[in-house]
């Protein structure tokens, strides 16, 4: 089976690997044929490259996987999903944006066009799955983000000192205050718990 995976491939520009680069590679290892787009940095070039890929590979692929976020990158998912519908290609949004529940509330018609017509919507968290189900979507499956657990050794601790690391932006949509509240609660049981926010 061949798949087209649409997302941001930015590691060649010096950024960390994204889901399309890690999951795409894992799917290849499982025997799937994978076409990917896009490594373009500029918004307009990236959306054009994604659209071109949908048209180019329309007869070769069974499904299109679309990394779907809640803010500006939502438009990639919207445009490419609608193009896939016109071309009669099944597509699967992979939900990443923690602010997607607000997108569901603020843009219900656009979201209906994308998510109700998807073959499946993949939620990596129970939070997003529940939010989509609460919004009336029945085609949502929970598939947690993958992690190669064998790369991480278990460190047995006699005394636990939690060290939290926040690696998201400080924008309000990511709710950075929640990390501080979690630290406050942890310090009730583990007074030496720390939080680093980068």
Label the predicted regions:
Residues 15-23, 76, 178, 182:
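Conserved alpha-helical elements of sugar-nucleotide-dependent glycosyltransferases
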Residues 31-56, 65-77:
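A short, charged, and often flexible helix/loop element on the N-terminal side
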């Amino acid at each position: 089976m061949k798949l087209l995976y649409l997302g941001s491939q930015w590691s060649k520009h010096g950024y960390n690997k994204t889901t399309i680069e890690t999951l795409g590679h894992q799917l290849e290892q499982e025997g799937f044929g994978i076409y990917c787009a896009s490594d373009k940095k500029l918004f307009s070039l990236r959306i054009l490259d994604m659209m071109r890929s949908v048209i180019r590979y329309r007869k070769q692929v069974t499904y299109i996987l679309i990394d779907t976020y809640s803010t500006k990158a939502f438009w990639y998912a919207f445009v490419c999903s609608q193009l896939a519908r016109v071309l009669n290609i099944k597509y699967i949004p992979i939900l990443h944006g923690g602010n997607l529940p607000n997108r569901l509330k603020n843009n219900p018609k656009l979201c209906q066009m994308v998510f109700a017509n998807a073959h499946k919507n993949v939620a990596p968290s129970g939070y997003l799955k529940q939010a989509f189900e609460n919004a009336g979507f029945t085609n949502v499956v929970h598939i947690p983000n993958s992690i190669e657990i064998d790369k991480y050794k278990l460190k047995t601790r006699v005394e636990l000192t939690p060290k939290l690391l926040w690696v998201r932006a400080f924008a309000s949509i990511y709710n950075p205050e929640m990390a501080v509240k979690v630290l406050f609660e942890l310090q009730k049981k583990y007074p030496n718990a720390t939080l680093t926010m980068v």
